[in-house]
C-alpha cells in the first residue's frame, strides 16, 4: 500500500514539474477565410493565404511580442512546489546543524576519530539483526568528518 502511495506521489510530482503553459498570445492568429471549395483548395495548395510559421509551446526563442507581465501568467505549480521543497530542505539542514554541532564539539574535545565513531556504530548494530551500518549512521559519520575538516582537525578524520 505504501508503494502505491509513493508511485502516485512521484507521478503527480513528475507531471506537475514537467509541464509549462505558453502565454495565450504567443501564437499569431491565422487569417480566416470563408469556407468554400475554392478557398479549401487554395489552403491545400498553400497558395492564396499568407501562412506564418506557428510557434510550438516549447520553442520560446522565436516568440515575439512578449510583454514583461506575460511570463507571470503561466502556470508554474511545479516550480512553486520545487522552490517550496528546497526552502524546507534548507530550513531542515540549518536546524539539523544547530542540533548536531554541540555533540560534534564534545566529540572533537575528546579527540574521537572518524574510524572510532564508525566502529562504535558497528558495535551498536551487532545484535540488532541488521547486516550493515544504516544510512543514517553513515550520514552522521560523514557530517562529523566534514565538521572536523571545517575546524582544521584533519588528524581526527582517519
Curated annotation (Swiss-Prot):
Residues 1-21 form the signal peptide. Keywords: Secreted, Signal, Virulence. Secreted effector that completely suppresses elicitor-induced cell death in host and enhances virulence of P.parasitica. It comes from Phytophthora nicotianae. A motif (RxLR-dEER) lies at residues 54-75. The gene is RxLR2. GO terms for cellular component: extracellular region; host cell. Induction: Expression is induced in presence of citrus root extracts or during the interaction with the susceptible host. It is found in: Secreted; Host cell. It comes from the Eukaryota. Belongs to the RxLR effector family. This is Secreted RxLR effector protein 2. Its main location: secreted. The RxLR-dEER motif acts to carry the protein into the host cell cytoplasm through binding to cell surface phosphatidylinositol-3-phosphate.
Amino acid at each position: 500500500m505504501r508503494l502505491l502511495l509513493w508511485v502516485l506521489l512521484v507521478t503527480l510530482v513528475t507531471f506537475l514539474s514537467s509541464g509549462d503553459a505558453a502565454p495565450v498570445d504567443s501564437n499569431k492568429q491565422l487569417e480566416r477565410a470563408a469556407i468554400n471549395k475554392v478557398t479549401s483548395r487554395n489552403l491545400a495548395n498553400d497558395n492564396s493565404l499568407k501562412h506564418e510559421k506557428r510557434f510550438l509551446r516549447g520553442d520560446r526563442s522565436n516568440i515575439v511580442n512578449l510583454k514583461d507581465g506575460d511570463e507571470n501568467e503561466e502556470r508554474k505549480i511545479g516550480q512553486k512546489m520545487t522552490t517550496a521543497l528546497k526552502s524546507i530542505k534548507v530550513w531542515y539542514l540549518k536546524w539539523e546543524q544547530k542540533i548536531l554541532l554541540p555533540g560534534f564539539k564534545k566529540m572533537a574535545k575528546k579527540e574521537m576519530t572518524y574510524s572510532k565513531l564508525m566502529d562504535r556504530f558497528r558495535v551498536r548494530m551487532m545484535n540488532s539483526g541488521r547486516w550493515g551500518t544504516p544510512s543514517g549512521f553513515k550520514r552522521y559519520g560523514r557530517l562529523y568528518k566534514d565538521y572536523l575538516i571545517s575546524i582544521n582537525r584533519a588528524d581526527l578524520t582517519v
